[in-house]
Amino acid sequence: MGTLYINQDDAFIGKVDERIVVKCNNKTLQEVPLIHLEAIVILGRATVSPAAIAELLKHKISLTFISEIGEYLGTLEPELTKNIFVRDAQWKAAGETPQAIHAVRGFIRGKLKNYRYSLYKTQGHYSELNLQPAMTIIQNVVNKLNKVDNINSLRGLEGAGSAAYFGVFNQLIRAEGFVFKPRHRPAIDSVNSLMNFGYTLLRRDVQSAINIVGFDPYLGYLHVQRYGRVGLAFDLMEEFRALVVDSVILNAINNRILTPNDFTVEPLSNVVRLSEGGRKEFLKLYEKKKQSEFKHPVVGRKCTYREAFEIQARLLAKYLMGEIDQYPPLVLK
């Protein structure tokens, strides 16, 4: 199963023998053997028994809490791995070091090239769209990355490339009733609501991968250090945004798996919230995407996106520890 999502309000999560049992109103909703679990994600309100928590920690299964509007609340997970050498290399590369600058270039190159790849695929399917100008801007930005030697300037290039992508995002939406507005948290439109939710799920999965490898998730290079921010998780998830989350969102909208009726608007705050049924459908699509296979261009074999999160984390660790000369971002062509 991999990840178990608890989408039922007022659910109770307990342990029976070697199984996790999910109940609501004394009715058993799910029973999953611990051996089949890698993570549990609770969306909304649910109660977890102390026995279940102890068993999850014992089996190194993370427990994540996400609010009903897709806001990441926190994760309970086992202690960091004992690989102090990875964290030592990570900290030594902090700041404006050549390694940090190179890593930031890689994160941004991967993100922008995958943005361009997404636009290229869509343009091929719908010749009436006018995505070429945005693709040209993104490519021009990518071409400038090697000419910049400080992280702040690289961040500026990342912003310019992202602006070109999101500037044509509405052209990628083929269903009525959905309009993308500038990125906003909390979301005040349905597309941003899906993005916030999807990126929260992606952040959790990438953070889990970097924890497995042995990184300190709070020390990133692209994202400015801030108290409580898992900077490295945000860094490494950049190259997966278009490939995983944006792809799932466009699939859900354009194939009418989600409709405007799957969203509600809070009367006072105008925050847009995905319904319980809508969350369930989105989670199905997200898990299916994570389990889908592709040929990884660096390792040269088929893998799932879930496996790719850890592969990229391990490649970054190898680079920082001097085992390889460059960090190769995941780029699909």
Ranges and model annotations:
Residues 34-48:
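Extracellular/luminal Protease-associated
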Residues 1-16, 25, 31, 73, ...:
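Active-site helix-to-loop segments that bind/position phosphate- or nucleotide-bearing substrates
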Residues 40-43, 61-67:
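Short hydrophobic alpha-helical runs that function as membrane-insertion/retention elements
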Residues 20-21:
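Hydrophobic residues embedded in beta-strands of well-ordered beta-sheets
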Residues 49, 70-75:
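Short gly/pro/ser/thr-enriched loop/turn and capping motifs at secondary-structure boundaries
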